[in-house]
């Protein structure tokens, strides 16, 4: 690649960062380093849920050092998104949004605001794009977008932008065990709409922790079952839905709503369209004997 091409690309990326950066704010809602946010719609900022540890006192710092107060409109830990409402009207630039999905290998920029409120950027490529993905807490992402770039502390809640400065989504380290990923536009917009309507998103909650285990051949033969694995209950939340249904520590969960379950992802998929208050049939093995329980779903607490 010639030096003139590289220089042109460099200027284009600098212009993209400058343009998109007008919509990026620092979000002061935790004790140390601020997180980042994006002025998403008129009067609204989107940021990361996990960075809001002091949600009762939120200060935003925009381009040029402009300080703004904001209140929490809603948050969803399952997608690590939060929506903030500005206390007063502000003359902030709205971003341009991309009308095409990111593709593997595309050059992208992650933007944020530093401790000193300067615009900062990290460059890289889209490292992977796959279909719909369930987060570890049960949220649904329309795409799983992995990044091959460094997402430095304070970048969560900031935008991923293309080489033209158009927003592709919101970056976070709060999902995927600390690995950087991007929440796609469709996911962000759907979540924002729900949070503005209800303040939170109700997710079903079992109130237990489980891990996959293999079933001994002798037990499978005794039960005349072809199921080779189940979920061992390693924790039951006191007074939670599973506790009230009679689930005990050490039970082996084999079926939920008549469907075999071999990992927790199976359960998240089975309950994806359920609402708190609904009931599900849960089949367990206790002391080698099958047992059927009726469990009333609770609501996933915001943490």
Protein language model features and the residues they cover:
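Active-site region of chymotrypsin-like
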Residues: 21-23, 82, 86-95, 120-178, ...
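Short, small/polar residue-rich loop motifs at catalytic or cofactor-binding pockets
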Residues: 31-34, 152-156, 230, 239-240, ...
């Amino acid at each position: 690649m010639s030096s003139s091409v590289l220089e042109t690309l460099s200027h284009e990326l600098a212009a993209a960062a400058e343009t998109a950066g007008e919509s990026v704010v620092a979000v002061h809602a935790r004790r140390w380093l601020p997180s980042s946010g994006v002025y998403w719609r008129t009067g609204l900022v989107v940021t990361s849920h996990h960075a809001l540890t002091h949600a009762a006192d939120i200060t935003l710092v925009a381009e040029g050092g402009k300080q703004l107060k904001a209140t929490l409109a809603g948050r969803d830990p399952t997608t690590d998104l939060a929506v903030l409402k500005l206390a007063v009207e502000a003359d902030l630039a709205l971003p341009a949004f991309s009308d095409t999905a990111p593709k593997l290998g595309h050059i992208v920029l992650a933007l944020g605001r530093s401790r000193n409120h300067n615009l900062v950027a990290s460059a890289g490529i889209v490292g992977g794009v796959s279909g719909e993905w369930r987060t570890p807490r049960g949220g649904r992402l329309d795409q799983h977008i992995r990044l091959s770039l460094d997402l430095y502390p304070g970048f969560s809640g900031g935008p991923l932008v293309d080489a033209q400065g158009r927003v592709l989504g919101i970056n976070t380290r709060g999902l995927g065990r600390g690995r950087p990923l991007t929440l796609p536009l469709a996911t962000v917009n759907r979540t924002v709409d729900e949070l503005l309507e209800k303040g939170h998103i109700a997710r079903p909650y079992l109130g237990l922790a489980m891990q996959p285990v293999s079933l001994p051949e002798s037990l499978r033969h005794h039960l005349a079952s072809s199921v080779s694995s189940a979920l061992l209950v390693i924790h039951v939340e006191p007074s939670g839905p599973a506790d009230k249904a009679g689930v005990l520590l050490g039970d082996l969960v084999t079926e939920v709503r008549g469907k075999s379950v071999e990992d927790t992802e199976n359960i998240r998929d089975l309950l994806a369209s359920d609402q708190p208050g609904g009931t599900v049939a849960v089949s367990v093995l206790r002391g080698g004997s099958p047992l059927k329980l009726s469990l009333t779903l609770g609501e996933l607490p915001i943490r």
